[in-house]
Amino acid sequence: ITGDLTNMETLFSVKELFNKILNCKNLDSRPVKTYVNNSSRTNYIFNTQISNIEKSDFILLVGTNPRHEATILNSRIRKSYLKNNMEIYSLNDVGDLTYPYKVISSNTDELKKIILNEHEVSKKIISAKNPIVIFGQSALKLNSSGYLFEGMKKFLSENNKINDDWNALSVLSNNASTVGAYDLDILDNETIDNVLSNKFELVFL
């Protein structure tokens, strides 16, 4: 299991060691199981550049507290709110973010309604010019995270909110090495399942 702050050179070397020398595929970069679709890099990066936050006119936070997880991002959201008076929604109450936001519910059924275009927030996303939906890591730990993430991506794509000029779906990583590890394909669901089930005799950290 690779660490949260491991640089890419070390990640690459460890992968080469395990795969080519030890002939072992039991390698993962996640300390806990989270949903990742690494078929495309856009599925696990923050697609909206920080500098483009101010162009947004609607933000939906899903399982994230940007004030604690990404302070620079949070300050940009605050700046955009003050400048554009944009609407901000959160799937749950995450406390004081230094700007007002509307709490939908902590129940994932509400997010399912948004995905199915059966919620008022669905209409707001569709009518927005540059909406942003930010998935945090806690949302990606849910048993239903795969359905929710892929469903949201499908909803945004069908309504032209994911296109060559704007990708409304972003993933906020908590750790410095996460994206690099995913780029190197250091992911294996069977491995992390076996680690969590204590099936290995030796775990190399």
Summary of predicted features, one role per range:
Residues I1-L205:
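Catalytic alpha/large subunits of respiratory electron-transfer oxidoreductases
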